[in-house]
Amino acid sequence: MKRTILYLMLAALALLAGCTQDEELSAKPVIYLYPESDAKPVDYLYPEAEMEVTVSLDYDGELTCVYPAMENGAWSVTASPDGTLTDASGQTYNYLYWEGVSATAYDFSQGFCVPGGDTAAFLEDALSQLGLNRREANEFIVYWLPRMEANPYNLIAFQFDTYTDHARLTITPEPDATLRVFMAWRPLSTPVELPAQELPAFERTGFTVVEWGGAEIS
């Protein structure tokens, strides 16, 4: 009998914790959240003239998908000024793709709480400020919007050093300009208040590398 009562008390506590999760977040936004995966980072290469480029990734986690395949831990492609990438077999690609699982803690001390129905407009504006061109922003939005727009709210924070410190790219020859846009986000049932994040501008010059990706925090 005592054991049964103990189980019932534990179950009740678990239910209360689950019911108050959003209320706690509303009162005080979570600063660090842990993702299940880093979803769809893609890398575009834009040299001024056609050149051979090698890209390697040092990732603090487990890679779950890579396309095209790496050889000896790196991609080796011929990059054209329009962004077309060609491998040794002659196959062409628009970008390099990878996905992985890590225990990185993403920073939500600043960011944005966006109503689900406003997500497309928000992303168009934010990605333009960050420096993605129209094609890159379109591919970003088409990937993420179906997961976000039906939510009542989305908590969004773009990650910079927090992301790049655990997913390090080495590119040879070294680019003149590198932009890495990574969005960590979480669906919410109620809004939260947090300081708005300042989004840095980016200038494309010479050999430019652009990456975008994101992680949904469940």
Give short role names for the model-derived ranges.
Residues 15-18:
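C-terminal motif of bacterial Sec signal peptides marking the signal peptidase cleavage site
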Residues 1-4:
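Positively charged n-region of N-terminal signal peptides that target proteins for export
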Residues 21-218:
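Protease-labile, long low-complexity intrinsically disordered regions enriched in Pro/Ser/Thr
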Residues 11-12:
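Repetitive helical segments and hydrophobic/amphipathic motifs
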